[in-house]
Swiss-Prot record:
Its EC number is 2.1.1.199. Its main location: cytoplasm. The lineage of its organism: Bacteria, Pseudomonadati, Pseudomonadota, Betaproteobacteria, Neisseriales. It comes from Chromobacterium violaceum (strain ATCC 12472 / DSM 30191 / JCM 1249 / CCUG 213 / NBRC 12614 / NCIMB 9131 / NCTC 9757 / MK). It is found in: Cytoplasm. This is Ribosomal RNA small subunit methyltransferase H. Specifically methylates the N4 position of cytidine in position 1402 (C1402) of 16S rRNA. The gene is rsmH.
Length: 320
């Protein structure tokens, strides 16, 4: 049987790479290689002395990246989560970089490959791991987690108002027989979510929540942001593409904190010119996909990109 081919459209492709303001001799990081759309465009803008290091947890993405690394000596791939950014770059002898790109969330090939268990559109083993070589599957977690933990995950990461009812139904069902497939979970959720948001399957929020939890997506995002910012050389840029409000909120709040001028009490006799300047500047407003891109790739509709740049100012006490 032939292996299915999945078309992956990279979201905000040119906008993200343009935001990095690529220097031909610079060192850049693509924290989420995926199928290499952003990485290939970055490489096309680098000169012979430029360098790109990419990260991914998905073995299928690593297979694609390995082929690219064999063709281009300027490119390195790291099979690890981006929360290991500082340690992995140190291992590669990289002390600072000129740009970091993060394209968060699950990729189109992962969603469209029914065997991965990310989507309720297919009947498949309930896996949801981005790295299928390690960790606990969604089915394994649902089989052992406390009802309260299931409820909290669905409520927090899915922003699902029916979390309590869904969690109770999951526990009741697993007492009869384990929930092992995407279809079983989707049907169960659909039976317990009475309202329907226009154009959205009732299982959408629950699947999102469990996927985020199984892959520790938000924890890893919180861990990598300060690492990426501190690795930037002066003038280096950080570009982060988010796909839902939970991710974007973390990015927005972190960048706001490190780009804010130092706050002093009103009575402090300090000239504005003498105040400590922030180590990070925000670059423009948040960027969204244009109408044409959304028409060609509906998944781009929820994408939002925030960009920041390292200043010459030193990191201040209290900066993350």
């Amino acid at each position: 049987m032939s292996t299915p081919t999945f078309v992956h459209r990279t979201v905000l492709l040119t906008e993200a790479v343009d935001a990095l303001a690529i220097r031909p001799d610079g060192v850049y990081v693509d924290c989420t290689f995926g199928r290499g759309g952003h990485s290939r465009l970055i490489l096309s803008k680098l000169g012979p002395s430029g360098r790109l290091i990419a990260f991914d947890k998905d073995p299928e993405a690593i297979a694609v990246a390995d082929r690219l690394a064999a063709e281009d000596s300027r490119f390195n791939i790291v099979h690890n989560g981006f929360e290991t950014l500082s340690a992995e770059l140190a291992r590669l002898g990289v002390a600072g970089v000129d740009g970091v790109l993060m394209d968060l969330g699950v990729s189109s090939p992962q969603i469209d490959d029914g065997s991965r268990g990310f989507s309720f559109r297919f009947d498949a083993p309930l896996d949801m791991r981005m790295d299928t070589t390690r960790g606990v599957t969604a089915a394994e977690w649902l089989a052992t987690a406390d009802e309260a933990d299931i409820r909290e995950v669905i409520k927090t990461y899915g922003e699902e108002r029916f979390a309590r009812k869904i969690a109770a139904a999951i526990v009741a069902q697993r007492d009869e027989s384990p929930i092992t497939t995407t279809r079983e979970l989707a049907v169960l959720v659909g039976q317990n979510v009475r309202t329907r948001e226009p154009g959205q399957d009732p299982a959408t929020r629950t699947f999102q929540a469990i996927r985020i939890f199984v892959n520790r997506e938000l924890d890893e995002l919180k861990a990598v942001l300060p690492q990426a910012a501190r690795l930037l050389n002066e003038g280096g840029r950080l570009a982060v593409i988010s796909f839902h409000s939970l991710e974007d909120r973390i990015v927005k709040l972190y960048l706001r904190d490190v780009s804010s001028e130092e706050k002093l009490p009103a009575w402090a006799m300090v000239r504005a010119a003498d105040m400590a300047q922030p180590p990070i500047d925000l670059v423009g407003k948040a960027i969204r996909a244009g109408d044409e891109e959304v028409r060609e790739n509906p998944r781009a509709r929820s994408a939002i990109m925030r960009v920041a740049q390292r200043t010459a100012a030193p990191w201040r006490e209290g900066d993350a």
